[in-house]
Amino acid sequence: MKLDPLQLIEYEIALLVRLTTAHSPRLGSLDRSEYLILCELDENGPLAINVLAEKLMLNISTASRQVGALETKKYIHRYPDPNNGRISLMEITQEGQDILIKVQKARYGVYKEILQEWSEEELKQLENNLTRLNRDFKKWGN
């Protein structure tokens, strides 16, 4: 039986998630949630927990738990918002930036090795399609 393209896409995405999870130790010492939170804070911080949760499409309790774990590891610092003392802001620490850079280099190396036989055109096409797919998923989830 021939599967339609959407069935194949769904399967390939599920397989990709499984493969990246199975090989996550080679992708660095941060789990996916830690990595995404540190990336967001590095790019856009400092942020309040509700803003961070919204950007990463997490509920507040999940985001709070993950932020707490990163705070324990000293990868982020939480402090009162100077404009509203009832709100805490979070920013990435130097230790957080150091581990993020280390993990980004490891991840880059893995993807460079995996995609070494792809042409620049194929890489650009993959980049465009993944960016579009993520954007459409975010739109759909709102």
State what each model feature region is.
Residues 1-32:
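N-terminal leader segment of winged-helix/HTH proteins
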Residues 5, 37, 110-111:
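Hydrophobic alpha-helical segments typical of transmembrane helices
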Residues 21-62, 72-73, 89:
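N-terminal helix-turn-helix DNA-binding core of bacterial DNA-binding proteins
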Residues 66-69, 129:
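Residues within the DNA-recognition helix of helix-turn-helix
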Residues 69-125:
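Charged, amphipathic alpha-helical coiled-coil/dimerization segments
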Residues 124-142:
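Exposed, interaction-prone assembly regions rather than primary DNA-binding/catalytic cores
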